[in-house]
Amino acid sequence: MLTPIQNFLKQEAAGGILLFIFATLAIILANTPLSYLYFDFLQTPVSVQIGAFIINKPLLMWVNDGLMAVFFMLVGMEVKRELLEGSLSSYQRAVFPAIAATGGMVVPAIVFLVFNATHPEFQEGWAIPMATDIAFALGVIALLGKRVPLALKIFLLALAIIDDLGAIVVIALFFSHDLSPQAFIFAGIAVAILITMNRLKITALSAYGIVGIILWASVLKSGVHATLAGVIIGFCIPLNGKKGERPLDDFEHTLSPWSAFAILPLFAFCNAGVSLIGMGMDNLTSTLPMGIALGLLLGKPLGIFSFCFVAVKLGIAKLSEGINFKQIFAVSVLCGIGFTMSMFLAGLAFGGESDSENVTALARLGILIGSGFSAVLGY
């Protein structure tokens, strides 16, 4: 089972380096005289209409709501495989990364809320520092080469997968609004078809793609965030086919390069462009970016390491062979690279605010600071 995991880790690491390049390019463009071209590009209107059904959104939203659904589909497939036969397939395997992920979600959120206790207008962003960008973190680890044992990389992967599950639950519970019963009915029908296809062990990617698009459009109109459709599709892809084939692995092999080398870099390019023009120390020291930055930089390692340490000392879990607490601490610092998922959650948290552009810019500034320092210190 290590071969697909090793392939996944290698691809995510390469994608993480590309993420860094595109994020840097976005920051540069957003702070040059050509910044208006960059921001106008993000707001380019794109419409799709079929009869009376129409979706009209700016390009930025198509990336965040549409292309990111493919990324979450891959997350769903990866979670399913790891739950059935991978690093999360038994209590003994799952308990240690699960405890680590719990600490890595709870403590950063607490740090953020402590910093923003007197600023209720910012408290919607409590989930932002909970996230870990697995591609970025693995990209940093890749720079260390063979000095990092495979067991530690698998621990990081399992932790990040559970972290993603936590983010999915947060999105479903706290970022749903203006629910539409009619759209839910169409979404329910699409899910029923996907489950039936899974039971029949249908392995055609095109079939799941067609039903998946219907599900995505229905979820988009339902008021629940559309990326959750991707997770559902991922869970419905069968692990094994009728003739011994591996459709889930095949689909992941087909889509992973598109996600790692196109979707996530494009997402980074569209979301990392924070204009620093006109920002002063009062912006940098605002409780919003400080809460996010310290949630990632301090909350993540404190939560992950302390929860792991206590769990081992109490006998609830044990360290994997070849891993020590020093390595766990280093990984916990790298988990403070929230970048992609934190940017995504920031857009959900503050997208509806009247002063959303300024608030979101401050949130992204905090993400960049916290993620940047975490990458440097973790390395």
UniProtKB/Swiss-Prot annotation:
InterPro entries: Na/H_antiporter_dom_sf (IPR023171), NhaA (IPR004670). This is Na(+)/H(+) antiporter NhaA. It is found in: Cell inner membrane. Signal peptide: none annotated. Keywords: Antiport, Cell inner membrane, Cell membrane, Ion transport, Membrane, Sodium, Sodium transport, Transmembrane, Transmembrane helix, Transport. It comes from the Bacteria. PANTHER family: NA(+)_H(+) ANTIPORTER NHAA, SODIUM ION/PROTON ANTIPORTER NHAA-RELATED. It is a multi-pass membrane protein. It catalyses: Na(+)(in) + 2 H(+)(out) = Na(+)(out) + 2 H(+)(in). Na(+)/H(+) antiporter that extrudes sodium in exchange for external protons. It comes from Pasteurella multocida (strain Pm70).
